[in-house]
């Protein structure tokens, strides 16, 4: 388990360990759970860590928030070279499943159509259009996964996860315009997934990798939208949501919440549900049920992991002390 001290890594370690799996964590932080302290850029360390394991779940990465603190070479070293080190070590060790946790940020500029265009319907077939070094290096790492699978027959599943971080939004206008939990519940309609559902997708990917050989999947909460909603979503998102969930306005009003005026993209998880048998639980409908009952819509696992931030030193909204979990 690379990145075993991160949001997803720690969640996976907790769940897998509780179920009796023997988990070896690899993380830069000395507090890494159950594991080895070090970098995936260290090829010899990676090979020692992978020896004897049945599966690799690769969550370690430089994220989008690191763009402001790390240069492009650092992104290439960690996200590309580090991933290649893991892939080659896993292939040499005869590992039975390699799960690469990627990101919907690989789609890049394809996610933001022109203002007068319908919302983008994002499936795995949409070609990536690089927007920043984070997305570019994650796309390159995905290509390496496919290459090593084809050359070495390493069973490899790529999970392009949407937002699951608990930190506040990085856009000033969003933080100023929305309560944090309000925004995250809205995002379940089209671009967010709960941490618990990401964990279940990873577990299924490990179990299905051998049969699949190779696969690339979007991991996001199941959207209620359909292609015929895309035009209206750009300028009349509240009316679309109202037709699908007539009760949402009253539930939101009790909290002083509001819906986004415009939605620019919709992530489609149909392939993951079909191929992996994935059944995400935490969608917008579930959130409304929780809010109606006076309960938190986030999973106990997500609440238990909490906010970690992305930097050891203060770095704006990405610093643990400056964030809010809602």
Question: For each predicted feature, which ranges?
Answer:
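N-terminal Rossmann NAD(P)H-binding glycine-rich loop of SDR-like oxidoreductase domains
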Residues: 1-19
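NAD(P)H-binding glycine-rich loop region in Rossmannoid oxidoreductase-like domains
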Residues: 32, 38-78
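Glycine-rich NAD(P)-binding loop of the Rossmann-fold in SDR/ketoreductase-type enzymes
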Residues: 41, 55, 74-82, 128, ...
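Catalytic helix-loop patch of NAD(P)-dependent Rossmann-fold dehydrogenases
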Residues: 77, 112-156, 184
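Conserved Rossmann-fold NAD(P)-dependent oxidoreductase catalytic core, especially the SDR/UDP-sugar
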Residues: 84-131
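Flexible, glycine-rich beta-alpha linker
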Residues: 107-108, 133, 151-175
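Alpha-helical substrate-binding/gating segment
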Residues: 167-183, 188-218, 222-224
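Mid/C-terminal beta-alpha module of Rossmann-like enzyme folds, strongest
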Residues: 200-260, 269, 274-275, 302, ...
């Amino acid at each position: 388990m690379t990145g075993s001290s991160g949001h997803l890594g720690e969640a996976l370690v907790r769940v897998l360990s509780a179920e009796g799996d023997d988990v070896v964590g690899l993380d830069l932080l000395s507090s890494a759970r159950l594991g080895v302290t070090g970098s995936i850029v260290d090829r010899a360390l990676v090979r020692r860590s992978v020896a004897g394991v049945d599966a690799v779940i690769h969550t370690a990465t430089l994220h989008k928030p690191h763009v402001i603190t790390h240069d492009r070479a650092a992104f290439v070293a960690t996200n590309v070279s580090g991933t290649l080190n893991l892939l080659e070590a896993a292939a040499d060790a005869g590992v039975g499943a390699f799960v690469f946790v990627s990101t919907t940020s690989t789609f890049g500029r394809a996610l933001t159509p022109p203002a007068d265009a319908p919302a983008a319907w994002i499936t795995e077939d949409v070609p990536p259009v690089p927007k920043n070094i984070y997305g570019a290096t994650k796309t390159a790492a995905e290509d390496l996964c496919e290459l090593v699978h084809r050359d070495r027959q390493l069973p490899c599943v790529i999970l392009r996860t949407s937002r699951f971080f608990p930190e506040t939004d990085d856009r000033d206008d969003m933080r100023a315009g929305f309560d944090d939990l309000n925004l995250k519940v809205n995002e379940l309609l089209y671009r967010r997934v709960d941490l618990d559902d990401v964990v279940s997708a990873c577990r299924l990917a490990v179990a299905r990798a051998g049969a699949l050989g190779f696969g690339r999947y979007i991991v996001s909460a199941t959207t209620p939208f359909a292609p015929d909603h895309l035009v209206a979503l750009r300028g009349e998102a509240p009316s679309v949501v109202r037709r699908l969930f007539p009760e949402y306005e009253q539930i939101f009003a009790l909290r002083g919440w509001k819906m986004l005026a415009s939605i620019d993209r919709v992530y489609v998880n149909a392939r993951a549900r079909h191929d992996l048998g994935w059944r995400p639980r935490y969608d917008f409908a579930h959130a409304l049920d929780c809010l109606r009952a006076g309960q938190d819509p986030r999973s106990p696992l997500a609440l238990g992991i909490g906010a970690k931030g992305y930097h050891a030193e203060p770095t704006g909204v990405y610093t643990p002390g400056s964030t809010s979990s809602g």
